[in-house]
């Protein structure tokens, strides 16, 4: 179970109030007002996997707060993983840390997890 976080300060008129950046290298991923707030619980692999996991299983956590980006070209800088169970996972294109969200292949929409990024303009 994930701890509840309050992201209300990051949302203005249903959009991201400030730029969205990688929490590790500060790379700009998404400019302000480009993502739409979306709540939907989805299991996303942990950023750090446990050593004792089997090769075909990923340790994951349920996340529910996302920035919805309908066109992948909207991103300033994002990377995509190989396809896993009908999804591609989003990573920082500069430092390759992640996943910071996922890309749904059926809708072609991207979901950037608020919990996995930082929100700041500089």
From Swiss-Prot:
Observed effect of gene inactivation: RNAi-mediated knockdown in follicle cells results in the apical localization of the basal membrane (BM) proteins trol and vkg. Results in the apical secretion of vkg, which associates with the apical plasma membrane with an adherent organization. No effect of the localization of proteins involved in intracellular trafficking such as aPKC, dlg and arm.
Places the protein is found: Basal cell membrane
GO biological process annotation, one example: protein transport
UniProt cross-references to PROSITE patterns, sorted A to Z: MSS4
Gene Ontology MF: a single term: zinc ion binding
GO cellular component: basal cortex; basal plasma membrane; cytosol; membrane
Zinc found in the keyword field: yes
Family: Belongs to the DSS4/MSS4 family.
Assembly, per entry: Interacts with Rab8.
Record function comment: Guanine-nucleotide-releasing protein that acts on members of the sec4/ypt1/rab subfamily such as Rab8. During egg development, essential for establishing and maintaining epithelial cell polarity by regulating the correct polarized deposition of basal membrane (BM) proteins such as trol/Pcan and vkg/Coll IV to the basal surface of follicular epithelial (FE) cells. Likely to function by restricting the activity of the vesicle transport regulator Rab8 to the basal membrane, and thus directs BM protein-containing vesicles to the basal side of the FE cells.
PANTHER family hit by this protein: GUANINE NUCLEOTIDE EXCHANGE FACTOR MSS4
Name of this chain's protein: Guanine nucleotide exchange factor MSS4 homolog
Species this chain originates from: Drosophila melanogaster
The organism's taxonomic lineage, starting at the top: Eukaryota, Metazoa, Ecdysozoa, Arthropoda, Hexapoda
